[in-house]
């Protein structure tokens, strides 16, 4: 009530907890869908009109309100889904994520291809430890995304999914932390031997990927296939020197790219 700009709140009935009674200013989503006529208005906005506000982690102070533009995000996500992940119209995309993680925004981007997106509300290990894989089999998911930690959990639990019907599953994407060699081996041995396993890395700052999978390069256990198309990505030391050889460093984009943040919200 204290946020004056909010005019209405749409309520999505959840389980058996909703009794249908709503206060003024609240509307039942099902009743809205049931209306025969819904007034729609479409307005034109600039290409980089604000679309998302994502918050930095807060490790370097107060979280920053990183603002991303609509057209910018549309181009980047369309590229990543269509050219890197081979998602097609009518495919089914499921990334297990909270709404506060940038992977939720990334998941929404699959709609630009004409794909259907699937949301899962609940624990990834309850009521059974293999519930997400069963969900993929039941819903015939084409692209399944999850954290590297989850794959490591499945490996430690020594679970096997060869009896699950995963013929529709073309791609498994992993992010959040590096996907180690042993996790790659587990996926191909215990989940599906002919799936495209893509370790990806990006971030809130770019609401997309810097490096990720592709359809043309070989998949090597413990490695990421390559750079995101059109991005000039390199690795530098903390002192600004280019890393040579098999050494650790910081991912750097050296030239402009679509999903550069347009501003910090209310930055003066």
Segments (PLM) and residue ranges:
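Structural core segment of the AMP-binding/adenylate-forming
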Residues: 1-31, 139-140, 147-148
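Adenylate-forming
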Residues: 63-65, 76-80, 105-106, 133, ...
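Conserved AMP-binding/adenylation subdomain of ANL enzymes
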Residues: 74-92, 102-142, 157-158
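Conserved S/T- and glycine-rich ATP-binding loop of Class I adenylate-forming
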Residues: 50, 56-59, 81, 93, ...
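Gly/Ser/Thr-rich phosphate-binding loop
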Residues: 115, 141-145, 155-219
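Conserved pre-ATP/AMP-binding loop-to-beta segment of ANL
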Residues: 10-11, 23-55, 62, 72-77, ...
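Conserved beta-loop-beta connector loops within the AMP-binding
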Residues: 232-255, 260-263
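Short beta-strand->loop structural element characteristic of the AMP-binding/adenylate-forming
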Residues: 1, 65-67, 116-124, 153, ...
């Amino acid at each position: 009530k204290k946020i004056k700009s909010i005019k209405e709140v749409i309520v999505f009935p959840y389980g058996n907890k909703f009794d249908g009674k709503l206060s003024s200013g609240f509307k039942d989503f099902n009743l809205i869908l049931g209306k025969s006529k819904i007034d729609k208005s479409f307005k034109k906005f600039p290409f980089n009109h604000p679309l998302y506000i994502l918050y930095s982690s807060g490790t370097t102070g107060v979280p920053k309100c990183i603002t991303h533009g609509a057209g910018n995000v549309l181009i980047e996500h369309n590229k990543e889904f269509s050219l890197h992940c081979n998602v097609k119209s009518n495919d089914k995309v499921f990334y297990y994520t909270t709404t506060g993680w940038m992977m939720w925004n990334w998941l929404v981007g699959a709609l630009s291809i004409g794909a259907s997106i699937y949301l899962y509300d609940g624990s990834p290990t309850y009521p059974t430890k293999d519930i997400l894989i069963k969900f993929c089999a039941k819903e015939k998911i084409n692209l399944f995304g999850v954290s590297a930690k989850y794959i490591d959990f499945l490996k430690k639990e020594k679970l096997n999914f060869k009896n699950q019907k995963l013929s529709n599953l073309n791609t498994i994407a992993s992010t959040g932390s590096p996907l180690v060699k042993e996790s790659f081996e587990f996926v191909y041995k215990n989940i599906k031997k002919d799936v495209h396993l893509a370790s990806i890395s990006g971030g809130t700052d770019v609401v997309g990927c810097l490096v990720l999978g592709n359809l043309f390069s070989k998949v090597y256990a413990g490695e990421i296939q390559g750079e995101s198309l059109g991005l000039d990505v390199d690795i530098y030391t903390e002192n600004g020197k280019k890393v040579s050889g098999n050494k650790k460093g910081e991912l750097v984009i050296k030239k402009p790219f679509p999903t550069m943040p347009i501003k910090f919200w209310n930055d003066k």
